[in-house]
Regions:
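ABC ATPase nucleotide-binding domains
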Residues: 1-84
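Alpha-helix C-terminal capping segments
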Residues: 38-41, 92, 100-102, 134-136
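Non-catalytic connector elements of ABC transporters
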Residues: 95, 105-200
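C-terminal boundary and immediately downstream tail of ABC-type ATPase nucleotide-binding domains
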Residues: 80-103, 128
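Alpha-helix N-cap/helix-start and coil->helix boundary motif
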Residues: 52-53, 85-86, 97, 177-180
């Protein structure tokens, strides 16, 4: 089919979820073949996908759709490492979004009794906490493990603050070999310089 498309000398190629119905092994092989095939095409290619890895491997720039509106086009590296919106942050895999508000010393996270040394974007903000910013430690903030999820490659602990059962939950990937159980109380530090924030 692609050979017929290129034979017609198109000015633009649109690929709409080209691998959505394929298993992982077949998808990977076809993706490599498609990349080789399209390397000779000099025109623009519009690639629609919900797979971030697929986009990262195949595209130089990206435009995210958020509630039917297109966000500004950005390069893939910027999207992955410096997502500009909450929608973009969710797309690249961030899972922890905590409500906070401006206070003396930075941003106070609602329910967690923690103040992050961040310059607040507004009076009320949403703070995105990458899992890499959560460091389990002997001292620091305390949290209770409310759930343990054993995934294919990782073990994830879902945390809530000891003092507030209604606060927003925090998801952390446990170091290999660390065992925790529901109800355990653990301590952690938070690397504020890795966190992102937006006006709420």
């Amino acid at each position: 089919a692609l050979a017929r498309i290129l034979a017609s000398e198109p000015r633009v190629i649109l690929l709409d979820e080209p691998f959505s119905a394929l298993d992982g092994f077949l998808k990977w092989n076809l993706e490599m073949e498609l990349a080789d095939f399209l390397s000779d095409f000099s025109g623009p290619i519009l690639w629609v996908s919900h797979d971030l890895g697929e986009c990262f491997r195949s595209c130089r720039s990206v435009c995210i759709m958020d509630n039917g509106a297109s966000l500004p086009v950005t390069d893939m590296e910027t999207l992955v490492h410096h997502p500009a919106t909450q929608c973009a942050a969710r797309l690249v895999g961030l899972r922890n979004f905590l409500p906070g508000r401006r206070c003396e010393g930075g941003v106070r996270i609602d329910g967690w009794e923690m103040v992050l040394p961040l310059q607040a974007a507004s009076e009320q903000v949403t703070v995105a906490v990458p899992e890499s910013a959560i460091v389990l430690a002997r001292e620091g903030y305390t949290a209770r493990v409310c759930r343990v999820i054993r995934d294919l490659h990782d073990t994830v602990a879902v945390l809530r603050p000891v003092q507030d059962a209604d606060a927003q939950l925090l998801r952390v990937v446990l170091p290999e070999g660390m065992a925790v159980a529901e109800g355990d109380v653990i301590s952690f530090a938070l690397l504020a310089d890795q966190c992102l924030q937006w006006e709420r």
